[in-house]
Amino acid sequence: MRIALKIAYDGTKFYGFQRQPDLRTVEGELIKVLKKLGIIEDVKEANFKGASRTDRGVSALGNVIAFNTAKPELAEARILNHHLRDIWILGKAEVPEDFHPRFWAKNKIYRYYLFDEGIDVIKLKACAEAFLGRHDFSNFARLEEFRKPVREINRIDVFSRGRIIVVEIEGKSFLWEMTRRIITALKLCGLGVLSIGDVELMLKEKVDKKLPPAPPENLVLWEVGYEGIKFEVDAYAIEKVKREFLERFRKYLTKSAILEDWLISL
């Protein structure tokens, strides 16, 4: 039986998603636990695949993995989450034998969290319009030989939440560092460093120097969408995950308040 799992993880605790020798990665930890519980024995035989190989520091609330197993009853959120740290199983689905979480994806949604450093949100939103549609993103990505640079952005939504600006980007597929380089452009537009015309030119012509990618820690792979795949949710497991998220939220919020007071006092 082939099983797909929807997963969340704190990317700051890992050296990226993809397995690397002697480094803690999301894929490596998942495979280790799946083998430990006897859910899979061999990675190749299990045809283990992931939807997105997120970079070091990038987190996820909706990445997806899939594998073949003779013990699907053990691939449950409450069982797996007990053995995982900084990774959480949020849903499970039985999928066709040829299901590949990357190639079957209908869309991917990313969220980036920007601290408002005097950013003009109206200018940022206007700049976002330039990225919509189908473009050559060579100037906004770290290119790989085997991947074509043309991609399509379905939508970019921008909304403020206190001192944080959230940018949500949706497309079918993304190039390496593409999302984070788009974010850099949007931020610079919002700060008045770049104009919409500059961005439009970069989408049409090659440039000598590319914009750097925005820091990975503020990027979240929010969702990977599929046609006809419905993930079952274990309510008990989700409640445990929410409690853990709440504890982390309290910790970071308190630390944020301390740092704010230090800044005010100095």
UniProtKB/Swiss-Prot annotation:
InterPro entries: PsdUridine_synth_cat_dom_sf (IPR020103), PsdUridine_synth_TruA (IPR001406), PsdUridine_synth_TruA_a/b_dom (IPR020097), PsdUridine_synth_TruA_C (IPR020095), TruA/RsuA/RluB/E/F_N (IPR020094). It holds the Pfam family PseudoU_synth_1. The active site is at 55 (nucleophile). Its EC number is 5.4.99.12. Substrate binds at residue 110. GO terms for biological process: tRNA pseudouridine synthesis. GO terms for molecular function: RNA binding; tRNA pseudouridine(38-40) synthase activity. SUPFAM superfamilies: Pseudouridine synthase. Disulfide bonds: none annotated. It is an enzyme of class 5 (isomerase). Keywords: Isomerase, tRNA processing. It comes from the Archaea. It catalyses: uridine(38/39/40) in tRNA = pseudouridine(38/39/40) in tRNA. Belongs to the tRNA pseudouridine synthase TruA family. Formation of pseudouridine at positions 38, 39 and 40 in the anticodon stem and loop of transfer RNAs. PANTHER family: PSEUDOURIDYLATE SYNTHASE (PTHR11142), TRNA PSEUDOURIDINE SYNTHASE-LIKE 1 (PTHR11142:SF0). This is tRNA pseudouridine synthase A. It comes from Thermococcus sibiricus (strain DSM 12597 / MM 739). The gene is truA.
